[in-house]
Each structure stands twice: as C-alpha cells, then as structure tokens.
Amino acid sequence: MMTDQEIRAAIERREIILDPPDFARIEPASYDVRVGNWAFASSSKEKINLKEKGLLVIDPGEFAVLESRERVELDNKTAAQLGLRSEYARRGLLMLSGPQIDPGFGGILVVRMINLAPKPIAMPYEAPFLTLQFFRLSNPVSKPYSGPQQGQFGISAQDIQELIETEGMTLGQVTKTLGALAKDVAELRGSVGRLSWVLPLIVAVGMAVVGAVVALK
C-alpha cells in the first residue's frame, strides 16, 4: 500500500491522475474523493444536479447512485481499492459497488449505495465520501483494464436502468408499509379494548329489559 508521500509523488509523475487534483485530500495512506455533479435516487426517478441543488438526501431504505467529482486514471503498474468513508458507514450508509480499481482504468467513479439507517443521510456536493488506497505493482500488467466502465463520464442511463430493474420494493417502502400495518393493528386493538367493556354493558342492559318484560307478565 502506498503512503501519503508515495501517493503525492505518483500524482506528480502522473502515474496516478486525479482531476482536479487536491493534495490537501491526501491522507496518511489514502486519498479522499468528493461527491460529484450528478446523482440518482430511487425515489426521484430522475438524475439530480448536485452542483445546482447542493446536496442529495438519501431517505431510509432508499437506493442511490453517485459519481465522483474527480476523474481517476491509473497507469499499468498501479491498482486501487475503493471504500466508503467511515463517517458515512457509521451513519448507516452501505456501498454496493465493487472495491477493486484495476490498472489502466480511467474515468469518473460511479457507486451505488443504500441507506440502512432509520434517518435520512445528506450527501453535500463536493463532500469527501470515498477513500482510495493505492498499490504499486512490481511489474506492469499485461492486460490493462478495458471493461465497460473504461472512460465513463459519470452516471449513465444504464446505471439508472439497472438500479430501477433490481430495486423492486425499497426498504423504505417496506418500512412505510409495515408502519401502516402496525398503525392498523394498534387501532384494531383499541377497538377491541373498547368492546371489552361495551359488550358486558349491552348484555347487562339486555338482561334487565328481559327481566322487566317477564315481570310485567
């Protein structure tokens, strides 16, 4: 794993390209990547311009796709590992994307997330939300990365479509449904509780009426 000094030197030699670069975001053994221009949340059904709106709010149980502010490019001797910053993980956010970034990759990072917490989580524009750890290989790879994410410029229509197709009922919708069901059950219990003393009263009144009728005979 590369240290802060090694990361800085690799950026200066352009073995690692982070555009726009910011040396202040270099940590002891990692680099913090920021929230980018666009996002998509399962409840909105459309892309959200974070540069204009300022932040993305991910509701409980909601899925979201975010892109990085930085374009990342690795040479053929450098690999990276991607992870969610601990402050967001502690608050209940879970990253659903693979952590490996292969040598030769170049493009905007696109990650899927879900909020497993009972409260909404805000993702401000340009806030550090991902951390990159870099690894220098002893030799260049023979086959640099050339997969479907190569050269991606951000969230694509395919990213959105895949999220919509795999979403089904979100945890948020499940939570709301269970909440409504719990409310109905509580109301039913209340009704049953009221009947528990109303019914004996009705029976008593009925018996009194019957007794009076019998006495009149």
Residue ranges of each PLM-predicted region?
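DUTPase catalytic domain/fold
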Residues: 1-199, 212-217
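Single-pass alpha-helical transmembrane signal-anchor segments
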Residues: 204-211
